Amino acid sequence: MVRILDGIPVRLLALMVMGLLFLCLEAGYRLSHRKPGLGDVSALQASVLGLVALLLAFSFSMAADRYSLRRSLVVKESNAIGTLYLRVGYLPEPSRGEMRAWLHRYTDLRLEGHEAANEPALFAKKLQESKLLQTELWSRLETLAPRIEAPVLILVTQAMNDVFDVGEERMAAAHNLIPTTIFVLLLIGMLCSGVLLGYRPEAPLRGLLSWSLFVVILTAVMFTLLDLDLPNRGRIRVDQEPLRSLQEQLRAHP
């Protein structure tokens, strides 16, 4: 399911949040000078900030778990393709050479696709090409099945299933994001804390320096979380080095 947040550029979203936080701080300041009567404002400020911190910690934990899963699946896919490549060596020629060439191409497509995850059209194109190669590999194995021994067929079939399965696992992990509801709750908590921090009936002037620090730090933390959660945009990306290393190994030992 595509979230609303995914369709908005990160910089624009950051500017919007910063603007909203400044507006909430200003609203709290003006409210405190029009109706100065809120008693335990400091206790309320601490409570709301504590809730925001709790939500941030919970969200970071979720995002970190998802990021770790995506990273481990890269290793798993690399190992699965490498195992299938070796087991294809049990098959007779010319199928062995053709299937290994297809696995070379399959590795290239998987690597190129995930490295271009921030370009949806190119990513979809590479993914579709890799699925066509999966069909070719499976069809060739079905053709060979009557002519090869059962133990060899079982080994190759299991390895091929693992390659196909981990590809689907990576797609599922890429779409397993923190729910939009949590980000909305986090934003509401941040805006409420902005109103409460701006509520300063004893202060004749606005605390622009403290306001700026509050807005910049809170926005930076929230968008680091968003960057960590989204695999197809931002600066925090899953390293594709295991697939890159496999690609080099396959080229060195065809």
Located regions from the model:
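Hydrophobic alpha-helical segments
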Residues: 1-4
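Alpha-helical transmembrane anchor segments
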Residues: 6-35, 172-254
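Loop-to-helix transition at the N-terminal end of transmembrane alpha-helices
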Residues: 37-49
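Short, solvent-exposed segments of well-ordered alpha helices
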Residues: 43, 64-68, 72, 124, ...
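Transmembrane signal-anchor/signal-peptide helices with a preference for the extracytoplasmic
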Residues: 55-75, 229
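Short extracytoplasmic/periplasmic juxtamembrane "stem" segments immediately C-terminal to an N-terminal membrane anchor
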Residues: 74-90, 239-254
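Structured inter-helical modules in multipass membrane proteins
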Residues: 84-175
